[in-house]
Amino acid sequence: MKQILQNLSNGETSLIDVPCPKNIKSNILIATTTTVVSAGTERMLIDFGKANLLSKAKKQPDKVKMVLNKVITDGLMTTVDAVRSKLDQPLPLGYCNAGVILESNVDGFEPGDRVVSNGNHAEVVRVPKNLCVKIPDNVDDESASFTVLGAIGLQGIRLIQPTMGECFVVTGLGLIGLLCVQMLRANGCRVLGIDFDSKKCELAQQ
């Protein structure tokens, strides 16, 4: 099957042939019909991969501390080999997937069901049952594939527990930011959206 993978050492992405995953307990095997490319997260990963080692270190100070601790415990060369090995591991891209179930080891999900999940950009994906939900008959796959992005915003909103009439500022009016604005408004909140990009601000006002 085909899958999009990224090389973290240089940021290059490739569409390659990989073995089809086998299903396991409490998981669902899905034939992909559509996926969403996240302009924020996935572009950030590609930019991170293209950066030199110093820039990568600056972007992940917590990982630098882990590497320094490993140097102390395991030695410099062992640590260098481990870092290079990690950067050379292909990274699957994508986390917004819609498709049709091929195999299911989970009650409530049957082969042929249309579902949305956090699966990668691949022809076939395997996901745990808690990261998969059925698509209603009146929703097409393309629209449903945006569900995960909405869920990310919704989780943030649940954490702040908004109440009717409260005022909130949403900083960043990308797709998730726009979804947060709409969900907060639907919850009866007053919302101010902020973004450096005037085009995104104009879109938010439509």
Which ranges hold each PLM region?
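Mid-domain Rossmann-like dinucleotide-binding core that forms the NAD(H)/NADP(H) cofactor-binding site
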Residues: 143-206
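A generic "binding-loop/recognition-motif" signal
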Residues: 97, 105, 120-121, 131, ...
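Residue-level marker of beta-strand positions
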Residues: 34, 113-115, 124, 167, ...
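Glycine/charged-rich beta-loop-alpha catalytic/anionic-binding loops adjacent to active sites
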Residues: 130-142
